[in-house]
Amino acid sequence: MCIRDRICDYQAYRQEVEIPQIKSDPFESCKTQNPHFSMGIFMRMLYSCLVDADFLETESFMKNNHVERTSGEEMASLLARLERHIGSWLENDDLNSINGRRTEILKACLIAGENDRGLFHLTVPTGGGKTIASLAFALKHAVRHQMEHIIYVIPYTSIIEQNAQVFREILGQDNVLENHCNVDYGDSEELKPMQLASENWDKPVIVTTNVQFFESLFASRSSKCRKIHNIANSVVIFDEAQMLPLEYLKPCIAMMENLMDFYRTSIVLCTATQPALDSIFDQHRRYIELCPNINEQFKFFKRVIYENLGIIEFDTLIERLKTEKRALCIVNTKKCAQQLYEQLSGDGVYHLSTSMYPKHRKKILAQIKERMSDKSKSCVLISTSCLLYTSPSPRDCS
C-alpha cells in the first residue's frame, strides 16, 4: 500500500469554507524603503497568527473547552481606573512644586493621547512622573484608536519589577502581564491564567525586556513567534530608550518603523536623556514630544550635583561610604558589591543584586523604604544597578 492510500481526504473543506478571490496585489500600494524586509515581517505575522490559533484550538480540544485563559478588561475600563487614581492630582497647578510639575506633564500626556498614531518622544527628567505620565498617554491613545495592547519594553528587570507593581496597583492584578526571565508563575492555579498569557501576550498591559521583545520579532522558533501578532494595533513604550544596544540599533529601528507603517502601532521613546535616534529613523518621519516646556522641567528637577571622584582605591571608597548617613553605591560586578557589603555590614547597610530572587529583592526594598521613612536613621545601599557613585554596569538578561 502506498502512502497516498493512507492519507484521509480533506477536500470537504471546499464545501465548508469560501475563500475569497484576491483581485489585486495587497502590497501594490505599500511604499517602503525595504520591501523584502517588510514582506518578511508580514510572513512572520501570518505565521504568528497560525501558530497561536493552532495552540489555542489544541488547548481547547484537550481541555474539552474548559480553558483557563482570561484576556483582561477593555482599555476604556483601564482608563477609568487610572482616572480615579490620578483624579486628585489633576487639581494641583502649582508649578513651583514637584507635584505641580508632575501634574503639568501628566495633563499634557492625557491631551496628547488624542493624536493620530505615530512616533512620540517623552523626555522627562528624573522625578517628573514618567511612569504614570506614559501610562496615561498610552491608555488615552489606545481608547482613542481602539488599540488592544500597551507594551512596555524596558532594559532592566529591576525596573520592570517596580513598574509592573505600580501598574498592578492602579489597573488590577489580572490586567498586567510581567514577562521576563525572572518571572516564574510555576504551578500555582491562581497564576495559571498569567502563565498561559505569557505564551501569547493576551493581556491589555505587558511589561517585558528589550531582549524578549526583539527576540520574539526576529526569532526562528514558534514559541517565540507565537506572541508577535499581538504587537499589532498596540502602543509600544520603550522606557530608557537610550539603552537600545548600538550594535543592533538599525534592525531595531527598522522593525519599529515597520510596526508603525503597517501594523497600526504607535511607538513612544521614553527617557530622561533622549538619544539621538532621529537621524536613524526615516528622514520624513516626524515625532511629537509629549513633555511640555522641556528645558524648564530639567532646570526645575535638577536636584543632583555630580562630583567626579576619579579613580579611587577600594579602602578609600569604604571610608567615604562610612561617613555618609544615606548613600547608594553602585558598582560593576556582583562580586565587588558583595565585598563592599561585607566590609560595611552593620545596622542600616543593605545589599541588592540580580543574583537574588525577585521576592528577596522586593523584601529588601520594602525594608529600605521603611527605614527611609525615619529621617533619623542611616541607610546605605550597595547595589549592582544604577544611580549614585556609579560605574557602567551591564544590562539585565531577558
Which residues does each PLM region occupy?
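Interdomain hinge/linker at the junction between the two RecA-like core domains of SF2 helicases
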Residues: 274-320
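Single conserved hydrophobic/aromatic residue that forms the stacking wall/gate
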Residues: 1-3, 389-398
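Accessory nucleic-acid engagement/destabilization modules that flank
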Residues: 4-81
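Conserved Walker A/P-loop ATP-binding site and its immediately adjacent core
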Residues: 149-169
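Conserved motor-coupling elements within RecA-like helicase/translocase cores
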Residues: 190-203, 358-380
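Post-DEXD/H (motif II) to motif III coupling segment of the RecA-like Helicase ATP-binding lobe
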Residues: 244-294
